[in-house]
Amino acid sequence: MEWRIKEAYVKYHKSKMLINIKNNNLHLMGYSEPVNKVLDFKKLKTKLHTLPDQPNAIPYRTSYYKRDWGFCLTHNQLNKIDKKKKFHVLINSKFFKGYLNYGEIFLKGRSKKEILFSTNICHPSLANNEISGPVLAMKIAKYLKIKNRN
């Protein structure tokens, strides 16, 4: 199933915005199901994810295999929330039959053996593998293509 998100936020009920994916798309747990409700902090807290050991970092969370929803925020943000207030939670998302985009290249070599390089671009805002992996794979392919000509 493909997942698409249009809008997602947590704000004080009829008041100040607290968490918004317009500020950082890591704020929403990947594959969150649609939600539009008002909650107290006790119920909301079960859906908030932080990294207490890294209080300024927003964690990356996803729920591919279980329908759920949640928000990710810095631990410092969590500590600043007024826990006595009510919260409006909105996740405007949808699931649908999608398609798989991919790229491939096959380079013949001297041997009949095959070597497969695989990479992905499925995690948002994570440059450590989401852009570095495809870039490195392209560089290796270019190098092997040039080397094979000589």
Model-derived features: positions:
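N-terminal hydrophobic/helix-forming segments and targeting peptides
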Residues: 1-150
